[in-house]
From Swiss-Prot:
It comes from Bacillus cereus. The lineage of its organism: Bacteria, Bacillati, Bacillota, Bacilli, Bacillales. Induction: Expression is sigma K-dependent and negatively regulated by GerE. Pfam families: GerPB. Keywords: Germination, Sporulation. The gene is gerPB. This is Probable spore germination protein GerPB.
Amino acid sequence: MNFYVNQSIIINSIKIDSITTSSVFQIGTAGSIKALSKFSNTGGFTEPLRPLQAKGQIISIKPSTSSS
């Protein structure tokens, strides 16, 4: 059995407080939702972060600016 859905959706404003790695944001009807996972190094980091010296320690995680 096939169902055909025609939709017209108008969104004047939308606010999303947070998106996590397991979030699903859907507008309208989805016949199926397929899993997709992407890992991106958006900070330009080239090596692991150094270990913390004390619990609750605040450290800078700015990527190095050296060019290679």
